[in-house]
Amino acid sequence: MQVFADIAVLREQIKQIKREGRRVAFVPTMGNLHEGHLTLVRKARELADVVVVSIFVNPMQFDRAEDLKNYPRTLEEDLSKLNGEGVDLVLTPTPETMYPQGLDKQTFVEVPGLSYMLEGASRPGHFRGVATIVTKLFNIVQPDVACFGEKDFQQLAVIRQMVEDLCMDIEIVGVATVRELDGLAMSSRNNLLTLDERQRAPVLARTMRWISSAIRGGRDDYPSIIEDAVDQLRAADLEPDEIFIRDARTLLPISSESKQAVILMSAFLGKVRLIDNQVLDLQTDTKASSEEE
């Protein structure tokens, strides 16, 4: 496994790989790797001859300085895990390398609409930061395919739209969320939970499954379902942040045309913000009754 901090040196390596006609898969990460990240790496290995991973805590996508400061950084452990998975190339740039003129003078990429709805409405600039860094990394790595986790559902939608809009010749593959045995979605932020918070954290996933069961059972009173879910979270001392039930393709409100719904949830446990989502098929009769209202 080769590790690069220098973009130009990595580019030369990628050029040689391309000249040899080998297919490149890319997994961008912010480090503090867990089984969810490694699942992305394994999927990438299935799809290409060469696997490239980046480790970069992107300051442009953080809306709170405290979150950026506290984000876990475990580079040596991360490199050991990637080496164990047979990763070929790893890019570990610094903020100064990625943003040599500083964030204020950085050209940015922004996906209209998707970037400022749902989570984007409460985190202005977040998805701009995501789209910008992913575009920069795509330009550096020049992958044929890139793998992203479905846990960050809106982020995946933003990236797919960006790739389509900018005519990037890159296949975007979404990989299912990996969960702990108690159902909690794996996340680097889970390491910041206290023991007591960690024991309560699975309530988020349980509440999400309850919402799914309610919809599958025929309920289409979505505002009322969300109110009930908020009560369930607060009963376990989780502070609800956002709960949405939307069309899984457009992220717009459910309509008679919707074939699938996505439940998007976030809640705070102490200072840690947890997120989760679930996609489910919609029954024809449920959609019809919802539209009639």
From Swiss-Prot:
GO molecular function: ATP binding; pantoate-beta-alanine ligase activity
Pathway it works in: Cofactor biosynthesis; (R)-pantothenate biosynthesis; (R)-pantothenate from (R)-pantoate and beta-alanine: step 1/1
Location(s), subcellular: Cytoplasm
Residues that, per the record, bind beta-alanine: Q61
Binding-site residues for (R)-pantoate, renumbered to this chain: Q61, Q155
Enzyme class: ligase
An annotated GO BP: pantothenate biosynthetic process
Binding-site residues, ATP: 30-37, 149-152, 178, 186-189
Catalytic site: H37 (proton donor)
Cellular-component GO terms for this entry: cytosol
Record-linked InterPro entries: Cyt_trans-like, Pantoate_ligase, Pantoate_ligase_C, Rossmann-like_a/b/a_fold
Top-level taxon in the UniProt lineage: Bacteria
Keyword annotations of the record: ATP-binding, Cytoplasm, Ligase, Nucleotide-binding, Pantothenate biosynthesis
This enzyme's EC code(s): 6.3.2.1
Family from the record: Belongs to the pantothenate synthetase family.
Note: The reaction proceeds by a bi uni uni bi ping pong mechanism.
UniProt function note: Catalyzes the condensation of pantoate with beta-alanine in an ATP-dependent reaction via a pantoyl-adenylate intermediate.
NCBIfam families associated with the record: cyt_tran_rel, panC
Assembly information from the UniProt record: Homodimer.
Full protein name: Pantothenate synthetase
